[in-house]
């Protein structure tokens, strides 16, 4: 019988350090079959909308994601079958024509702002993490990321943060903290928490051998 992969959910607010925590886990297991799948890859296709309409999309609301597809593909990976993960184009605000082939792995990190919001996703996870970072730090990181990587203007980032991102965080994301097995204050700089998580993952991997 094929062993079930370990699935780790990593969530928290935008710019909170989720990706850094996920990479810290990835880097600790170089000899294992381990990968990270981002919820952001599953933003819904918006090619049927005009560019002006796409720009107004609330990307921090659960309905912005095709979570059904993510769950379907995770179940395929659990069963040992490869999947083609969608690629989202942030400059065009819609799904790209490209996909990325993902082979089954021993450890799958599922990362995103709302990965603990859907019970069906939570039920697939062995470990659930919430990265808890101060609002001021998160907005600074978001400004830097969106200007450098997503060709956004400062004004548009600040407007989106105050009108959408911050309210959605308190409405949808922060409440999922109660589902977390571990809450990590200050993200990847919390070495003790990262070490505890890596120890737990190593223990599960050893038990599965």
Swiss-Prot record:
InterPro entries membership: P-loop_NTPase, PRK/URK, Uridine_kinase, Uridine_kinase-like
Cross-referenced HAMAP family: Uridine_kinase
Gene Ontology MF, one: uridine kinase activity
Protein name in the entry: Uridine kinase
Superkingdom in the source lineage: Bacteria
Catalysed conversion reaction: uridine + ATP = UMP + ADP + H(+); cytidine + ATP = CMP + ADP + H(+)
Enzyme Commission number(s): 2.7.1.48
GO cellular component entries: cytoplasm
Residue positions binding ATP: 12-19
A GO BP entry: UMP salvage
Family, as annotated: Belongs to the uridine kinase family.
Keywords annotated in UniProt: ATP-binding, Cytoplasm, Kinase, Nucleotide-binding, Transferase
Pathway: Pyrimidine metabolism; CTP biosynthesis via salvage pathway; CTP from cytidine: step 1/3; Pyrimidine metabolism; UMP biosynthesis via salvage pathway; UMP from uridine: step 1/1
